[in-house]
Structure formats: structure tokens, C-alpha cells
Amino acid sequence: MNNSTALQTLDAILEIYARPFNDLIYAAQQVHRLHFDPNAIQCSTLLSIKTGGCPEDCGYCSQSVHHQTALQAEPLMDLEQVRAAAREAKANGAQRLCMGAAWRSPHDRDIEKVAAMIGVVKEYGLESCVTLGMLKPGQAERLQHAGLDYYNHNLDTSPEFYGEVIHTRSYQDRLDTLEAVRDAGIRICSGGILGMGESRRDRARMLQVLAQLPQAPESIPINALVPIPGTPLEAAEPIDGFEFVRTVAVTRILFPKAYVRLSAGREAMSDELQALAFLAGANSIFLGDRLLTTGNASTGHDQALFNRLGLHRSAD
């Protein structure tokens, strides 16, 4: 277990969740100020380097071959496309470029191509992150050798609810990939998706599993489901805004030193809801009007919101 937070029982985490809203936000903000500048937001950019055609059946995803969505599959980007994206990310003030590929598990030849992309990203002084699916022995080490800073592999939800959403990859597969990444000396980015029909207990359980990893993730993305037509979750009810903010606050309390990122779904959030999430301890966002396959708040809108709230981009 990584630290005292890993000793939290599920009931204890649920008790934190159930605190009066003002008390919960106050506690989370106190924790946040112990480890971060409360007005600094870390900014990343997300790039889909290989889109669609994924053999997995994740119920939320437009890239699955199992679902009838309007998404058109695209091949792996070439280095010059990645270079252009890195240049734009740097110009927009991002500190990290996160590259995602719709693979179940990459071939070794794919890893070599991604390794070259990581090199291009590093040329621009950006941190690098990739999300490529499950990794085979030796692949994490190759990525680390290429200079990879972060590997994203979300747990998505609790072990108990997971089977309601995904059938082609086990929960243990995800944990095994996180272990391989950590063993290779790469920092971990891992979180979940809210609003898939899970309960508060499921959300608390997911956080408990993350807390029980040998070392806590350095980055924890909190996604709000973006229902996509043609996917099994297209009619899912959106998560209550206060429940979303509660989850951010509990995440901050359990993981004092992690970056807590507002990820997918932010485009649909009001400025007021985002401000509450920042107050609850969120301190990272994706810049740009596109994530992997869904929309995102524009960089101009984000900067205007930062100005209204007195926030600034983190220099770390």
C-alpha cells in the first residue's frame, strides 16, 4: 500500500463523500493548499494518433468496432503530423502532450513508431504521455527508454461495476498494465468515468483501488461521460454536478499530491461547475477544442475563465 490513504476502508471513503458539501469542499481545499499553488492549473493537450477500429467493446467509446457510430477510422499519424501538433500545443501554453491510440494492445513495431513520436514531443520541451492499451513484457521499458513521462491507463470504474461496461478486457488486465508501467519507472495517469450508471459506492471503490496501488498515481483524470450516439451508453443520465464535485473533492483528499484533471465532459460543464471543481482540488485540464473523439472547451474560453477566477497556468 502506498501510504496511509491506502488504509482507508470503503466505508471510511463513503463517510468522506457524505460530509456536508461545504465541509467537504473546505477540507479538500485545505489539503490542496498543502501541496499545490491553489490558483495554478496544469495544462495538457490530447492528440489521437490512431483513431477508431478498436476491437474492445467499452460501452462509452465511439472508437469500438462493436458500436455503430459515425466515427471514421484513421491510420497511425506520421511524425510530421505529431510535430505540428506538438508545435501547436507548445504555442497554446500546454506543458504536456498526451497521445492516444485505439489499440487493444500495440505490436512491437507500433511501439517503435510511438517511441519516435515521444522524441519529437520532447524536442519542444513538452512532457509526454501516451495511452496505447495493454502492454506486453518489455514494451513499457522501451517507452521509458524513449523518454516517456506518463502512461495513461484508466480503471474506469469499480471492479464490481466494470463488467456492466466492458467485456473484452478484465479489470486485472488494467491493473497488470499499471504494474508494468510502474515497474518500468514511468509515472502513472489513471482515473475513471462518472455517469455510466455506477453508484457512489462504485466511485468510492474505484478510488480505493487506486489508493491501494503500491504507489499512488501522479495524475488522476476525472471524466464525465459524454454520451455518444451508437454506443450502449448513449442514453445514460448525466451525473449530478454536485456529485461530480464531491468526487473531485474526495479524490483530492485521498491523493494529496496527485494532479486531479478535469477531462472528458468539460465542454458541457458550466463555468460555475468548473469553478467549484477547481475549489474542490482539481488542478489540471486539457487545452484545445478536441479530445480524442469528443469536443472540449476552446482554449480562448479557458483563458477567459482563468482570467475571471484569477487562475494561471502552472509553470511545473
UniProtKB/Swiss-Prot annotation:
Binding of [2Fe-2S] cluster, residues: 98, 129, 189, 261
Reaction catalysis annotation: (4R,5S)-dethiobiotin + (sulfur carrier)-SH + 2 reduced [2Fe-2S]-[ferredoxin] + 2 S-adenosyl-L-methionine = (sulfur carrier)-H + biotin + 2 5'-deoxyadenosine + 2 L-methionine + 2 oxidized [2Fe-2S]-[ferredoxin]
Subunit structure: Homodimer.
Keywords (A to Z) from UniProt: 2Fe-2S, 4Fe-4S, Biotin biosynthesis, Iron, Iron-sulfur, Metal-binding, S-adenosyl-L-methionine, Transferase
InterPro entries assigned to the protein according to its UniProt record, in alphabetical order: Aldolase_TIM, BATS_dom, Biotin_synth/BioAB, Biotin_synthase, Elp3/MiaA/NifB-like_rSAM, rSAM
Name of the encoding gene: bioB
Pfam families: BATS, Radical_SAM
Disulfide pattern: none
One of the protein's GO biological processes: biotin biosynthetic process
Role noted for this protein: Catalyzes the conversion of dethiobiotin (DTB) to biotin by the insertion of a sulfur atom into dethiobiotin via a radical-based mechanism.
Binding site for [4Fe-4S] cluster: 54, 58, 61
Enzyme class: transferase
Record-annotated Radical SAM core domain positions: 39-263
Cofactor note: Binds 1 [4Fe-4S] cluster. The cluster is coordinated with 3 cysteines and an exchangeable S-adenosyl-L-methionine.
Gene Ontology molecular function: any one: iron ion binding
Listed name of the protein: Biotin synthase
Pathway(s): Cofactor biosynthesis; biotin biosynthesis; biotin from 7,8-diaminononanoate: step 2/2
Signal peptide bounds: none
UniProt cofactor(s): [4Fe-4S] cluster; [2Fe-2S] cluster
EC number: 2.8.1.6
Similarity comment: Belongs to the radical SAM superfamily. Biotin synthase family.
